[in-house]
Amino acid sequence: MTRLSEILDQMTTVLNDLKTVMDAEQQQLSVGQINGSQLQRITEEKSSLLATLDYLEQQRRLEQNAQRSANDDIAERWQAITEKTQHLRDLNQHNGWLLEGQIERNQQALEVLKPHQEPTLYGADGQTSVSHRGGKKISI
């Protein structure tokens, strides 16, 4: 087996691992309540796999430039890697949309909770005002 074949096999393995991690990410983002620590672990694992894939891609280019002989087996492996990469790009985009939806729902929940954060009191003028905790209002 040539060095290029080994690199392509390693890339395939990393892409399969990345698919598993991205499926887990999608599952986390699809549930009603996200486990933050679990999502962070998944994100770190995904980043590590992407860094490994980037390194392998650099090695593949160096090796391929050195060989420059077209080989059917190599071409088939590269085609499979290209297809997996395109699928993972689409999956990552979908996960990004799910994450944006979660962020939007969290923002809406915060907006609902915000008015209830501090009690409303009546001021000397009879109008409602929000109390300021931890100090007096000073005007100069």
UniProtKB/Swiss-Prot annotation:
GO terms for biological process: bacterial-type flagellum assembly. Its main location: cytoplasm. It holds the Pfam family FlgN. One of its GO terms (cellular component) is cytoplasm. It comes from the Bacteria. It is found in: Cytoplasm. Residues 119-140 are annotated as: Disordered. Keywords: Bacterial flagellum biogenesis, Cytoplasm. Gene3D superfamilies: FlgN-like. Required for the efficient initiation of filament assembly. Belongs to the FlgN family. This is Flagella synthesis protein FlgN. The gene is flgN.
